[in-house]
């Protein structure tokens, strides 16, 4: 960053003092006297990115190294010459890649098939597929979060050097993630009714009706994010945050 600003004739972004602190921090991360950040001169807030000297891997901070996915299926079938049936049950869990928050999908499905054949020239078929999707994640649209993580400066700290509940700074996306929650519950049912008449061998007359309905419930909860100033006072973070609203 300094080299770029120098090339376009502007003053350095990082002072030499900050660069020296960065080098010390690399040797002794968060060691004594190296909190990664200090208060501004008025002690009313924390210094900005140009004065911080941490070494944060934001991808490692927010993302898991791996995610769990598992599926379970059970089916039964049977019948006679006149009636046959099939019932299949399934469950799938897919964990997301975000590490700090709930980020998952639960999927349940029931698939049933029935056939009734009263005689050689007539048969009835009924198929029904019900699916329930349960999604839990911080935001309806996660793209803004992924964008913000990718552009976070590595020299900025994840926490301010004050113990307590509100020690996440305003530039850490986790502050906002911890105060939002989105859930989507969606049930879908697709049904097919069919009747087949065979007046002559090789000649099938088929009547079919398909019905589908979807019911979806979305819920978005948002709380007030708070952070702590250097003097220990709690501050409400009220500035609008892009993407942290419904529908996203």
Please place each PLM-identified region on the residue numbering.
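Surface-exposed loop/interface segments of Gram-negative outer-membrane beta-barrel transport/assembly proteins
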Residues: 1-55, 92, 96-190, 206-208, ...
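Outer-membrane beta-barrel channels and translocator barrels
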Residues: 69, 80-81, 117-121, 198-202
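A beta-strand signature from Gram-negative outer-membrane beta-barrel systems
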Residues: 1, 69-71, 84
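N-terminal entry motif of extracellular EGF-like repeats
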Residues: 57-59
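Beta-sheet entry/capping signal
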Residues: 73, 84, 202-207
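Residues on the lipid-exposed face of transmembrane beta-strands in outer-membrane beta-barrel proteins
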Residues: 74-80, 112-116, 191-197
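Short Gly/Pro-enriched turn/cap motifs at secondary-structure boundaries
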Residues: 62-67
